[in-house]
From Swiss-Prot:
Keywords: DNA damage, DNA recombination, DNA repair. The gene is recO. Signal peptide: none annotated. GO terms for cellular component: bacterial nucleoid. This is DNA repair protein RecO. GO terms for biological process: DNA recombination; double-strand break repair. Involved in DNA repair and RecF pathway recombination. Belongs to the RecO family. It holds the Pfam family RecO_N. InterPro entries: ARFGAP/RecO, DNA_rep/recomb_RecO_N, NA-bd_OB-fold, RecO, RecO_C.
Length: 250
């Protein structure tokens, strides 16, 4: 059966010497794995069309199991996401988070909207690292956990100015008054906790201007990755490149 669906490539894996297996998140919010024959050969024209983040109309044959890609009518190549290693690595983290949050057969229209929103924001100049934080905040529940950043997990104190870190012992933010009860709490700036709470609750269609200092973005990114590792046992493949880039900076 010949299928035509709009979608975005969220995963691309080399298969053999000349083929690729790509996964698209289609416009209905479903993951569709496709075999792209000879996609690594320049002459086929599929090499550029099967890169990560390509948004287009995918035409493929589907019977049982994995479909076979015929062609792609590219709507957006998202070149900016591929020209800078930092941008590409954090955009990959966002895509990987969404891809791994879904089991086979899941249909999640919101995930498609979220991915489109994030890629468009990055294209327009918003920090890719910040947008990866947004995705990870929005996908937490799909990995089986949540996190509270707006009140002390020990006392219930919801005075934002009193919050000074995140406690894995008590599973939530911790205030300065209770800090002695967890000497291993991760110390965070008050602004980081506040913005994590805002971004977690704010609908994506209300996120207009996102201008946040890099130090705050770094803190948010670090604690979010720690939360995923601690509560969901997740280590993302994209992190490997991110960690390598950070080491080169030191």
């Amino acid at each position: 059966m010949l299928m035509r669906q709009k979608g975005i490539i969220i995963k691309a894996v080399d298969y053999g010497e000349s083929d690729k297996i790509i996964t698209i998140l289609n416009e209905h919010g479903a993951k569709v794995p496709l075999m792209a024959r000879r996609a690594k050969k320049v002459k086929t024209g599929l090499q550029a069309q099967t890169q990560l983040f390509v948004y287009g109309l995918f035409i493929y044959n589907k019977w049982r199991g994995m479909g076979t890609l015929n062609s792609v009518d590219v709507i957006s190549q998202h070149y900016k996401l591929q020209m800078d290693l930092y941008v590409s690595s954090y955009a990959s983290l966002a895509a990987e988070t969404i891809e791994r949050s879904m089991d086979e057969g899941d249909v999640a229209p919101y995930n498609y909207q979220l991915l489109q929103f994030v890629l468009e924001k990055i294209e327009s100049g918003t920090s890719a690292q910040l947008m990866s934080v947004v995705v990870m905040l929005k996908c937490m529940k799909r990995f089986g956990f949540t996190a509270s950043f707006n009140r002390c997990a020990v006392s219930g104190n919801d005075t934002q100015a009193d919050l000074i870190g995140y406690s894995f012992k008590y599973d939530g933010a911790i205030s300065r008054q209770e800090a002695s009860k967890d000497v291993h709490a991760v110390i965070l700036s008050n602004k980081t906790l506040y913005l994590l709470d805002v971004l977690q609750k704010l609908p994506i269609d209300k996120m207009n201007s996102l201008n946040i200092h890099q130090e705050i973005i770094d803190e948010m990114s670090d604690i979010i990755l720690m939360l995923y590792r601690e509560y969901a046992g997740m280590f993302f493949k994209s992190q490997k490149l991110i960690n390598q880039l950070k080491r080169l900076e030191q």
